[in-house]
């Protein structure tokens, strides 16, 4: 027997939500609106959707940091991928709107911490390197539905899209910590809520957060290509360094 209970679901549940097709099926069974998502396990599966490629997003069923994502590619771009049962892909309907990310911690299906945010700058198409908090009641209800429906224990995160009419659709799930954790800076309150008997803890950081070194490496070149230096300068001026913790200079020095 393990000396301590892992603060996470069983491996089967973790695999289910991390798989980009299985997660959408789970959300659908929980009564949530979801984007049409097709599992691709063969060249025949790929050919069946090739004609609609301009309306779809293609990504490996097992992936993170937006690796290998093809966003509304031309049909010939699909020649670069070869889905199989051991390396499946998904074809998901492209959803226009505002992307929202969610980081949550739950115990026995009840939310104990939740941070909602949007990425202002990214490392290429992947992880956010500058992000700001947002509030959205529909997104909170979606997260509550999933953690309650799964009896979730531990950390769980989501990439979602809010459409123009306010409807929020889940795109994928990451059963781990993500950048939203940086919006909690009071260790005592966080630990009391997550591991003790304290009430749900709200984020105590309201300013945008950034990884300054990554902003110079990824954000500046992207701003130059897009002709958007003004937004880059504003982010560098207003956002706080996520690694800058009072009394602990080591993370910033390591960067």
Language model feature labels by segment:
Residues 73-142, 161-169:
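Phosphate-binding site of ATP-dependent enzymes
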Residues 66, 120-125, 130-131, 174-187:
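Glycine-rich phosphate/pyrophosphate-binding beta-alpha loops
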Residues 136, 179-197:
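Gly/Ser/Thr-rich active-site loops/lids in small-molecule metabolic enzymes
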Residues 150-183:
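Conserved metal-phosphate-binding beta-hairpin within the catalytic cores
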Residues 46-52, 79-84:
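Short amphipathic alpha-helix with an adjacent loop that forms part of the alpha/beta core around
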Residues 192-255:
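Peripheral (often C-terminal) accessory segments that flank ATP-dependent C-N-forming ligase machineries
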Residues 1-41, 48:
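Conserved N-proximal alpha/beta basic substrate-recognition cap immediately N-terminal to
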Residues 27, 37, 50-69, 86-97, ...:
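ATP-grasp fold ATP-binding core
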